[in-house]
């Protein structure tokens, strides 16, 4: 690898630190602000130079389209696992479901988070859980009425507000366009995978 200028080394360290702390690379504007550049274009020129030297990879079309080469990534199984598509009948934390690990301190959430789940759809938008968010989840097996849970119903995983009435469970959306999911425990399978304890959006805790 060709040697870096002091400014390039500073930017590379900022990128690594941002990924370690938030799980996301910084935007060009964030780099410019933190390092005192007059514009995001100045940051872009330095990023192109870093890419030419093989220190980073630039993915066009997105403000956070910066990634470290594989050898630069922290591939250790530390931090919070991000759960992707969940296979029927498999534990949600099975290794094959883990897309990657985010360097996020679990104690930032209360109670502490055990894993992250990428939100799909807008059924919980009225309480600020949006498509593409990373939902921080504390693993439990039981829930109280009113809690927002990650539930598995007949092997479909969903995020909803929990309500139990006798042998019936209602999983309520926070969007008037969606009807509650009704689960009759006498013949349907319901597993509580965890409680929603926070949201990460664009690298920020909400």
UniProtKB/Swiss-Prot annotation:
<comment type="subunit">
    <text>Homodimer.</text>
</comment>
<keyword id="KW-0238">DNA-binding</keyword>
<dbReference type="Pfam" id="PF01726">
    <property type="entry name" value="LexA_DNA_bind"/>
</dbReference>
<dbReference type="GO" id="GO:0003677">
    <property type="term" value="F:DNA binding"/>
</dbReference>
<feature type="site" description="Cleavage; by autolysis">
    <location>
        <begin position="88"/>
        <end position="89"/>
    </location>
</feature>
<dbReference type="InterPro" id="IPR036286">
    <property type="entry name" value="LexA/Signal_pep-like_sf"/>
</dbReference>
<feature type="active site" description="For autocatalytic cleavage activity">
    <location>
        <position position="123"/>
    </location>
</feature>
<keyword id="KW-0068">Autocatalytic cleavage</keyword>
<keyword id="KW-0805">Transcription regulation</keyword>
<dbReference type="InterPro" id="IPR015927">
    <property type="entry name" value="Peptidase_S24_S26A/B/C"/>
</dbReference>
<dbReference type="GO" id="GO:0006260">
    <property type="term" value="P:DNA replication"/>
</dbReference>
<dbReference type="InterPro" id="IPR036390">
    <property type="entry name" value="WH_DNA-bd_sf"/>
</dbReference>
<keyword id="KW-0227">DNA damage</keyword>
<comment type="similarity">
    <text>Belongs to the peptidase S24 family.</text>
</comment>
<keyword id="KW-0678">Repressor</keyword>
<feature type="active site" description="For autocatalytic cleavage activity">
    <location>
        <position position="160"/>
    </location>
</feature>
<dbReference type="InterPro" id="IPR050077">
    <property type="entry name" value="LexA_repressor"/>
</dbReference>
<keyword id="KW-0378">Hydrolase</keyword>
<dbReference type="GO" id="GO:0006508">
    <property type="term" value="P:proteolysis"/>
</dbReference>
<comment type="function">
    <text>Represses a number of genes involved in the response to DNA damage (SOS response), including recA and lexA. In the presence of single-stranded DNA, RecA interacts with LexA causing an autocatalytic cleavage which disrupts the DNA-binding part of LexA, leading to derepression of the SOS regulon and eventually DNA repair.</text>
</comment>
<keyword id="KW-0804">Transcription</keyword>
<dbReference type="InterPro" id="IPR036388">
    <property type="entry name" value="WH-like_DNA-bd_sf"/>
</dbReference>
<dbReference type="GO" id="GO:0004252">
    <property type="term" value="F:serine-type endopeptidase activity"/>
</dbReference>
<protein>
    <recommendedName>
        <fullName>LexA repressor</fullName>
        <ecNumber>3.4.21.88</ecNumber>
    </recommendedName>
</protein>
<feature type="DNA-binding region" description="H-T-H motif">
    <location>
        <begin position="28"/>
        <end position="48"/>
    </location>
</feature>
<dbReference type="Pfam" id="PF00717">
    <property type="entry name" value="Peptidase_S24"/>
</dbReference>
<keyword id="KW-0235">DNA replication</keyword>
<dbReference type="GO" id="GO:0006281">
    <property type="term" value="P:DNA repair"/>
</dbReference>
<dbReference type="InterPro" id="IPR006200">
    <property type="entry name" value="LexA"/>
</dbReference>
<dbReference type="GO" id="GO:0009432">
    <property type="term" value="P:SOS response"/>
</dbReference>
<dbReference type="InterPro" id="IPR006197">
    <property type="entry name" value="Peptidase_S24_LexA"/>
</dbReference>
<dbReference type="InterPro" id="IPR039418">
    <property type="entry name" value="LexA-like"/>
</dbReference>
<dbReference type="InterPro" id="IPR006199">
    <property type="entry name" value="LexA_DNA-bd_dom"/>
</dbReference>
<keyword id="KW-0234">DNA repair</keyword>
<dbReference type="GO" id="GO:0045892">
    <property type="term" value="P:negative regulation of DNA-templated transcription"/>
</dbReference>
<keyword id="KW-0742">SOS response</keyword>
